[in-house]
Amino acid sequence: MAALLLLFLFLFASSALSQDSLIGVNIGTEVTNMPSPTQVVALLKSQNINRVRLYDADRSMLLAFAHTGVQVIISVPNDQLLGISQSNATAANWVTRNVAAYYPATNITTIAVGSEVLTSLTNAASVLVSALKYIQAALVTANLDRQIKVSTPHSSTIILDSFPPSQAFFNKTWDPVIVPLLKFLQSTGSPLLLNVYPYFDYVQSNGVIPLDYALFQPLQANKEAVDANTLLHYTNVFDAIVDAAYFAMSYLNFTNIPIVVTESGWPSKGGPSEHDATVENANTYNSNLIQHVINKTGTPKHPGTAVTTYIYELYNEDTRPGPVSEKNWGLFYTNGTPVYTLRLAGAGAILANDTTNQTFCIAKEKVDRKMLQAALDWACGPGKVDCSALMQGESCYEPDDVVAHSTYAFNAYYQKMGKASGSCDFKGVATVTTTDPSRGTCVFPGSAKSNQTLGNNTSALAPSANSTTSGCIPKYYHHPHASFGDLTLLSLLLIIALVFL
């Protein structure tokens, strides 16, 4: 019976992961206070996001994703494209340093070579396919070509006459690049990567495209757009653009190349002339898009064929140049607070970013370590926090450093005090966050995971307010000079206490 139960749970979890992995997020870094890679990963895990796209191959970020199972798209930045395209050795070195050094611990699935090269870096268009081929050859040499795909993201503006979709075609100016590119994608089994922004199509249409049509809002049957050639009905701009890409490939006799949408989103704030960049519209678009993708609705041309889609983007990038809207595409602020709460009823756990009622207290990283240690000692002593989880061999002992241990103790005190104002300060060395700091089997007080692991046994979280015991002895929480004898005696006392409880 136990074996059957475990099998059921495994199959259930696998099914949920498969469903949720259709949605990913882009992680831009043009941010004033960019969270650390470990904080980024913690936020992604709390939101059940299993796919990400990076705009480079940052070492610290790739290390943070190790052993998480998150599927990662890494990128060759545009400024490295020329060098990659001119030398097989340069491409091989890039793959060695940025792929082989991390795979398979970090689940790199795709290498995006450049970004919107045909429309934003036109002078490099002629070398794009060469760069793709050199990277592919390097993967073959490293025996990684079956696990990792190579492609390049395009702006949807390379497609002309996108409505009706059946008449769409690629800008013929780029035929010398597009045709060999599609041949490469077909021969390697790689997807066409496409950036799809109904927001820009709507704004540039000057009122021709209805807002509801851009936002996936329900339309009356007589208001749906109909392709007169195929009689296919289109209820949203997103599907029309994706199908336009399918038809454009068909026009060139490529019919079996899948499409992955590498960017799509809606800005939540704009300048005086950007009237439709609002929180309500951003929430509506992204909520409806995620529902649409997760439900595997597909497109009118390919119904039931899910289009893996990456939301643009995880954080607001406040240092990006351009209009106000360019700085406000994020789902979250850098402190982990959601910009808005997505409406995802029935869409599962992914991006369930209503974290407004789930707050935690963590230690600040760039503060005096002696002040942290003093605050930790107070929390585990006079503060009456149960710090037993920080003992050597227990679930929260690793990493054995004062920041990690202080975070656990500070948060336990904060939760015990009912998140009262002032209970997360500790003389300036602590701060409140909405990102769950739990990791692996180390489940923090206040985490939604604590209900799964502890049930109703809240005694493990913190001692009673009436307790006369300290809950811990300061010296066995990040104290490198505690002796083996001290630890053994304390462990023995704990065992005796547990026996007689």
UniProtKB/Swiss-Prot annotation:
Sorted alphabetically, the keyword list is: Cell membrane, Disulfide bond, Glycoprotein, Glycosidase, GPI-anchor, Hydrolase, Lipoprotein, Membrane, Plant defense, Signal
Glycosylated where? Answer: N88, N107, N171, N253, N295, N353, N357, N451, N456, N457, N466
Example GO biological process: defense response
Quote the catalytic residue positions: E116 (proton donor), E263 (nucleophile)
Organism lineage: Eukaryota, Viridiplantae, Streptophyta, Embryophyta, Tracheophyta
Q: Which cysteines are joined by disulfide bonds?
A: C361-C424
As recorded, the propeptide runs across 471-501
The entry assigns this protein to a family as follows: Belongs to the glycosyl hydrolase 17 family.
Give the main EC class: hydrolase
Tell me yes or no: is Chaperone among this UniProt entry's keywords: no
Residues where lipid is bound covalently (GPI-anchor amidated serine): S470
Tell me what organism the protein belongs to: Arabidopsis thaliana
Q: Name one GO cellular component term.
A: side of membrane
The UniProt GO MF terms for this protein read: glucan endo-1,3-beta-D-glucosidase activity
Q: What kind of membrane protein is this, topologically? A: Lipid-anchor; GPI-anchor
- Could you tell me the superkingdom of the organism this chain comes from? Eukaryota
**Protein's name according to its UniProt entry:** Glucan endo-1,3-beta-glucosidase 3
Q: From the UniProt record, list the reaction(s) this protein catalyses.
A: Hydrolysis of (1->3)-beta-D-glucosidic linkages in (1->3)-beta-D-glucans
Query: Cross-referenced PANTHER family, in alphabetical order?
Result: GLUCAN ENDO-1,3-BETA-GLUCOSIDASE BG1-RELATED-RELATED
- Write down the EC number: 3.2.1.39
